[in-house]
């Protein structure tokens, strides 16, 4: 606290004397790493935005990128989908432990006991080889889910971590049956309207402007988004679920989502860049404290788009790029490290807390599809 006071006092004195205060964060390494990433991988551009509990501290576009740049985000879609389901859970329309059989009684007996929690943590036992229906035209989400459920299980549910998108497709279809609404309608009501998203939908390959509907959205990897939109998402997560002082989600729900589901489980299938990390619900667990509580989460995509939230440090970041994510991953990790290092010296000035340790708060105020509280 004493050091924080000295830092703030020095800045105020410099301002009063007409001398420019030293920037609170030196992000020159991050800027250099961003430029190097673009050059090394022949990217058309890149966008980087960083924030702390006090607000945005850095936003930069390189090359052809700008505020309107919209890209497919691949597996960063998983985090959006998980947050969408979390809204339904808090509204009482779903539970994380709801089994498949409650919504698909016609499914084979072997899969009826699989829960939404397992479907969204890659522990369902469903095979990871991509189902053909994920990319099929003229197929609905319901039809795709039934096709996936009809296949033999690769592992016993809850016994193995195996990364893949098939299981999340089933969870999305369960949400449709639970609410009686399409995934598009759910997403528009639970994410787009209350968060003020203007460039995010589930048609990754589309070139049209606006929100383009999709009868069979790829729940685990089919979204496209912008720097501004995803920044709103990670700002909400960093703030423990708050949006402009009102509860979008509770800290308890975010803590449940961030809990590592891979502990004690054999790893049957995982991206080669993520073998040392855990997994929660739609998000990777990148760091933990000495007690094992999650302190940093992320959801990088195959094309390089990388969002993260670090509760211990009180910071978040979104890197928007489109290229070969596997080839870029080492350089992206170095860029993320440069960002975290730049924000680290002043972490005591931030006020964000891990959602596992929520402070006292008033009863949650839920935002509806129009942004009104109720």
Identify the function of each model-found stretch.
Residues 67, 72-76, 88-131, 150, ...:
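Active-site helix/loop module of the DD-peptidase/beta-lactamase fold
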Residues 65-68, 151-157, 167-169, 211-219, ...:
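Flexible glycine/proline-enriched surface loops and loop-helix/loop-strand junctions
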Residues 326-374:
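Short, gly/Ser/Thr-rich active-site loops of penicillin-recognizing serine hydrolases
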Residues 34, 48, 54, 71-97, ...:
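Active-site SXXK
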Residues 119-122, 167-174, 219-243, 252-254, ...:
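Active-site-proximal alpha-helical segments within enzyme catalytic domains
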Residues 35-66, 96, 134, 138, ...:
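A short, well-structured edge-of-sheet supersecondary motif
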Residues 199-221, 225-228, 258-318, 349, ...:
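Active-site Gly/Thr loop motif
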